[in-house]
C-alpha cells in the first residue's frame, strides 16, 4: 500500500477548529490516507484517543499502517460513517470531544484506474467506495429506467443536459452493455453538443459525480452520519466538515444551522411557547476555503469548504 496517496485538505484549519487536547476522544469519520487523523493524534498527545472510520478497505489498510505508531490511542473500524452512532455505542463510547469529516474522494481512489471513479482512464465502471457490497455504476446505467437516470444525473450532478444524457445512455445500452468508464464517457460526449461543452469542465464530470453519489448513497450517509455525530458531541466539543460540492455543503450548512437554531415561534407571540433552545453555535458563519498556496500545491483543494460547529 506504499502507493496510496492522498493529501488532506485544510489540515491547519481543521486542527485549529478542533483544538485537540490530551484526554479527548475524537472521531475521523473518513480516514482516507489518515492525514487528519495523524494530526489530531499528535496534537492530543500523550493520551488523546481517536476512532477512525472508512468504508474503503484499501484506506483502512493504509490507516492501520500509518497510525500504528500511536498504539492503543487509535481504533480503526471498517464501516460507513452513516452508522457511526451505533458503531460507537457498540464499543462503549457515548460522548466525543470532536469529529472531522472530509467528504472528498481520495486522490488514490480517483487515480486507481480499477476503481472506476475517473473519466480519464479506461476501467470497469465500478465507483463503489466499499467494493464488498452494493451495486456498481455499471449496474445502475444498465438497469435503471431512463426517468430514474435522468433524476440522478439532474439532481446529483446538477447537469443541465441530464435528459439527453439519460436518453443516450439508454440507447447505447440497448446496443451493448456499458461496462467501462470510457464507454460511458463516449456516450456522454455524444449527448452534449460540443459547442456547449464548458471550457474548464470535462463533459463527463457532472454525470460521473452523480453516479458516484448514487452508487454510494453519499447524501443519505452524510445526513445520517452528521445527525449521529452531533448527538454525541460533549459540551464544548466541535465538529468540522469539509465538503466539495454544493449538494454536500447545503446538507452541512442546513444541518448545522438547524442545530444552532433556538426559538421558532412566530415573532408576534410575546413569549416563547415552543421551548426550543439552541444546542450548538456556528463557529463559521461562512465556510473556510483553501488559500492560494494550498491550491497551488493541491489543486483538488480548490473546491473545499470547511464548516465548524460547537456544542454549547
From Swiss-Prot:
Pfam families in alphabetical order: Methyltransf_5 (PF01795)
Family classification: Belongs to the methyltransferase superfamily. RsmH family.
Catalysis: reaction(s): cytidine(1402) in 16S rRNA + S-adenosyl-L-methionine = N(4)-methylcytidine(1402) in 16S rRNA + S-adenosyl-L-homocysteine + H(+)
Principal EC category: transferase
Keyword Transferase: yes
HAMAP family in the record: 16SrRNA_methyltr_H (MF_01007)
Function as written in the Swiss-Prot or TrEMBL entry: Specifically methylates the N4 position of cytidine in position 1402 (C1402) of 16S rRNA.
UniProt-recorded name of the protein: Ribosomal RNA small subunit methyltransferase H
Highest classification ranks of the organism: Bacteria, Pseudomonadati, Thermodesulfobacteriota, Desulfuromonadia, Geobacterales
GO annotation, biological process: rRNA base methylation
Entry's localization field: Cytoplasm
Amino acids binding S-adenosyl-L-methionine: 34-36, 54, 81, 102, 109
Source superkingdom: Bacteria
Major place of residence: cytoplasm
Alphabetized Gene3D superfamilies for the sequence: Putative methyltransferase TM0872, insert domain, Vaccinia Virus protein VP39
Amino acid at each position: 500500500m506504499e502507493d496510496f496517496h492522498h493529501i488532506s485538505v485544510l489540515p491547519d484549519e481543521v486542527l485549529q477548529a478542533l483544538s485537540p487536547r490530551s484526554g479527548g476522544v475524537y472521531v475521523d469519520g473518513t480516514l482516507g490516507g489518515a492525514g487528519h487523523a495523524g494530526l489530531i493524534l499528535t496534537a492530543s498527545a500523550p493520551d488523546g484517543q481517536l476512532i477512525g472510520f472508512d468504508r474503503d478497505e484499501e484506506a483502512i489498510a493504509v490507516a492501520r499502517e500509518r497510525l500504528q505508531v500511536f498504539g492503543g490511542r487509535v481504533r480503526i473500524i471498517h464501516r460507513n460513517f452513516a452508522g457511526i452512532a451505533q458503531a460507537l455505542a457498540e464499543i462503549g463510547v457515548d460522548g466525543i470531544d470532536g469529529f472531522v469529516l472530509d467528504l472528498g474522494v481520495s486522490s488514490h481512489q480517483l487515480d486507481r484506474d480499477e476503481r472506476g471513479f475517473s473519466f480519464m482512464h479506461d476501467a470497469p465502471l465500478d465507483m463503489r467506495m466499499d467494493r464488498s457490497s452494493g451495486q456498481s455504476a455499471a449496474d445502475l446505467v444498465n438497469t435503471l429506467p431512463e426517468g430514474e437516470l435522468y433524476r440522478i444525473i439532474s439532481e446529483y450532478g446538477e447537469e443541465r443536459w441530464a435528459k439527453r444524457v439519460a436518453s443516450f445512455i439508454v440507447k447505447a445500452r440497448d446496443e451493448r452493455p456499458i461496462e467501462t468508464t470510457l464507454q460511458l464517457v463516449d456516450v456522454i460526449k455524444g449527448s452534449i453538443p460540443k459547442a456547449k461543452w464548458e471550457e474548464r469542465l470535462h463533459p463527463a464530470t457532472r454525470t460521473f459525480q452523480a453516479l458516484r453519489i448514487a452508487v454510494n448513497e453519499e447524501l443519505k450517509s452524510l445526513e445520517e452520519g452528521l445527525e449521529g455525530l452531533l448527538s454525541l458531541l460533549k459540551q464544548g466539543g466541535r465538529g468540522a466538515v469539509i465538503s466539495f460540492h454544493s449538494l454536500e455543503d447545503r446538507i452541512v450548512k442546513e444541518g448545522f444551522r438547524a442545530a444552532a437554531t433556538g426559538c421558532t415561534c412566530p415573532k408576534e407571540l410575546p413569549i416563547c411557547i415552543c421551548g426550543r433552545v439552541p444546542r450548538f453555535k456556528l463557529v463559521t458563519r461562512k465556510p473556510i476555503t483553501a488559500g492560494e498556496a494550498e491550491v497551488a500545491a493541491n489543486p483538488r483543494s480548490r473546491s473545499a469548504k470547511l464548516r465548524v460547529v460547537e456544542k454549547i
